């Protein structure tokens, strides 16, 4: 695959990670009042208008039915489980801690992209990913007690679901349109989560309307970015840039919840950024070699 395509996909992924961090902060705020399943439903329902507008603008309704239904349905189910378990983690853990545990996903994506997708993962990528994961461990300083709680296990389950979702995107991207990937994911996520949320549904507070709308917008834009990145770039090259969300989570924890990172968190964050910059540099060198 062209290194230029990988570099473009990496830039899109970095932007998507920032948007998703904003969305996750909004969901954490909502989770203090609403049940996890309802937060999941509100996130997907708020994104529906943006998705439908996008599909209409692209005039892609015909492509909506020409899809590989089994994989889309599987991805929809995985998405519901992924978001619900992630919200459970957000409710009980700090945003930065939640992200730290979740960042096992890029390593899982890279590992599974070899046997499932047949991608080649060179030594440099493994080193960069391993280095980034080391930074995550420094931030978390896991002793076992912090990870193996219900909230910690929920985030690990969410990361595993995200891993399979990313791989399914790559498989579907070979035959299905980008619009169909987004349309059916959000539609199935909204339908499934709303159905399960109805028994415990709480009235929407007026003061939460702006927050729900913001979650919908950032969720749509972030989903577009992730779908684009995994569809047009190599999964194993894109996955490490999930780590950049850590930087945004540190800032939002300080801004909203008044929690400051300690020196271990700062050291770990520096390592994570360094591993990402190393891969960006590597992809750029390859791109220049292909197009002198």
Predicted regions and their residues:
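Loop-to-transmembrane-helix transition segments
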Residues: 8-16, 55-56, 61-85, 150-158, ...
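Transmembrane alpha-helices of multi-pass small-molecule transport proteins
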Residues: 33-81, 161-165, 184-199, 274
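C-terminal transmembrane-helix exit sites in multi-pass transporters
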Residues: 105-127, 247-266
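Hydrophobic transmembrane alpha-helices of multi-pass small-molecule transport proteins
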Residues: 124-141, 264-283
């Amino acid at each position: 695959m062209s290194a230029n395509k990988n570099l473009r996909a990496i830039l899109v992924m970095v932007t998507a990670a920032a948007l998703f961090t904003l969305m996750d902060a909004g969901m954490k705020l909502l989770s203090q009042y609403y049940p996890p399943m309802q937060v999941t439903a509100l996130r997907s329902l708020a994104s529906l208008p943006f998705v439908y507008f996008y599909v209409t603008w692209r005039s892609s309704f015909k492509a909506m039915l020409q899809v590989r239904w089994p994989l889309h349905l599987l991805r929809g189910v995985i998405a519901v489980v992924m978001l619900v378990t992630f919200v459970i983690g957000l409710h009980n853990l700090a945003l930065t801690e939640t992200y730290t545990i979740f960042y096992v996903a890029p390593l899982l994506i890279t590992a599974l992209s070899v046997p499932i997708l047949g991608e080649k993962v060179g030594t440099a990528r493994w080193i960069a990913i391993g280095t980034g994961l080391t930074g995550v461990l420094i931030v978390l300083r896991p002793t076992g007690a912090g990870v193996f709680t219900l909230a910690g296990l929920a985030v690990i389950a969410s990361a595993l679901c995200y891993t399979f979702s990313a791989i399914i995107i790559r498989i579907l991207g070979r035959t299905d349109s980008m619009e169909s990937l987004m349309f059916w994911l959000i539609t199935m996520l909204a339908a499934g989560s709303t159905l399960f949320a109805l028994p415990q549904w709480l009235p929407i507070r007026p003061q939460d309307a702006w927050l729900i709308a913001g979650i919908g917008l950032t969720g749509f834009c972030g989903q577009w970015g992730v779908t684009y990145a995994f569809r047009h770039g190599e999964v194993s090259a894109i996955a490490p840039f999930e780590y950049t969300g850590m930087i945004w989570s540190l800032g939002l924890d300080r801004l909203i919840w008044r929690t400051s990172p300690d020196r271990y968190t700062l050291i770990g964050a520096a390592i994570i950024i360094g591993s990402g910059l190393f891969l960006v540099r590597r992809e750029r060198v390859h791109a220049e070699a292909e197009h002198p």
